[in-house]
Amino acid sequence: MALRVKFVFTCLTSCVFLAFIHLTPGLAQSKWSTPAQVEGPYYPRTKPKEVDSNLLDFLGRGWPDGEPLQLKGRVFDQKGVLIEGARVEIWQNDNNGIYNHHKAPNREKFDRRFQGFGSFITKKDGRYNFITLVPVPDHKRPPHIHVKIFRGQKEILTTQLYIKDHPENNRDGLLSLMLYPGQHKLLIELKDAVIKPGLRGKLGIYDFVLSKNF
């Protein structure tokens, strides 16, 4: 009887602890850091003439082809503390699967209305916010968005984000090598959303957890 009471008490204690972790902002994220992935060949060493967080409004050239995506979230350290002043960079292909990079195949066909690269400095609440395009498959790889995070001039994280449940994911070499706990956190769920008045598209929310404390 005593053993049964002890077992029930232990189970209840565990459930309460798990609920506490789930409901406490930032605490759950500190369990795993965001997995790193390779930079890839198309990081823009020469940046576009205009660099901001809205990749669809570039030099007044008009709207690029493709489905709009709002990608937003927060940046935490390992303790679950929100990080202010981190520079989040993203780069990706256009709606034709082409990068704006001198080594990219078919670069001459890149949609010049698309910025292709963006940057955002996190606020006091650790938040970042981009308006970009839903990525498309390219070079036999599933849709993905490349990400770098800096603190000052120091690069803290390089990784890639993928679309959850996309059929191309199972064919990708990098995703098939996800052997370590937490690698699934590179998958983001996209939902229909009103990004801003008059602009409908997809919404993806992703919180980065850096492997260091600051």
Label every PLM stretch briefly.
Residues M1-T13:
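Bacterial N-terminal signal peptides that target proteins for export
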Residues L3-K6, F20, K202:
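Intrinsic disorder/low-complexity segments
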Residues K6-F9, T24, A28:
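Hydrophobic alpha-helical segments with strong N-terminal bias
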Residues V8, I21, Q37-G40:
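Generic N-terminal simple sequence motifs
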Residues T10-H22:
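Bacterial N-terminal signal peptides
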Residues L27-L187, P197-F214:
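Beta-strand-dominated extracellular/periplasmic modules and repeats
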